[in-house]
Amino acid sequence: EFRKSDIGSSLPQHFRWSQVGSQSIQLSWDDHKVNGHTPDQVHLFVIPRSSSLQRVEKQVAFSAKTVILEGLHGNTLYYVILTVSAGEEECSITSAQSELRSMCIK
């Protein structure tokens, strides 16, 4: 279970976390422009603090407005790097880092 205080609040405006299961969390966002650009891709890099666990990378279309991170482990701190890109430019137009701590997962 994730408590509100377990989820870092350093997301950009229009993005939010919510719990969808005991080992899953969802990132959702509103349709919006970033620095005047309409984004087309959302990239998530999920890096567990424990080196014995695998990092996860997710990429979804911005139009999906949601992505679910599954298979999170209990009592584990995760660093999540969010990057939003537009067009063929490889550079991100916004980036944020959040911390997730999964607690009480059975």
UniProtKB/Swiss-Prot annotation:
The residue range of the signal peptide is none
Q: Which SUPFAM superfamilies match?
A: Fibronectin type III
What domain of life does the UniProt record list for this protein's source?
Eukaryota
Q: What residues does the Fibronectin type-III domain cover?
A: 11-106
The family database entries (InterPro entries) matched by this protein are listed as: FN3_dom, FN3_sf, Ig-like_fold
Q: Please, what other remarks does the record include?
A: ONCA and ONCB are the primary targets of protective antibody responses.
Give the protein name, as stated in the record.
Answer: Oncosphere antigen B
Q: Which organism is it from?
A: Hydatigena taeniaeformis
At the highest ranks, the source species' classification is: Eukaryota, Metazoa, Spiralia, Lophotrochozoa, Platyhelminthes
Gene (name only): ONCB
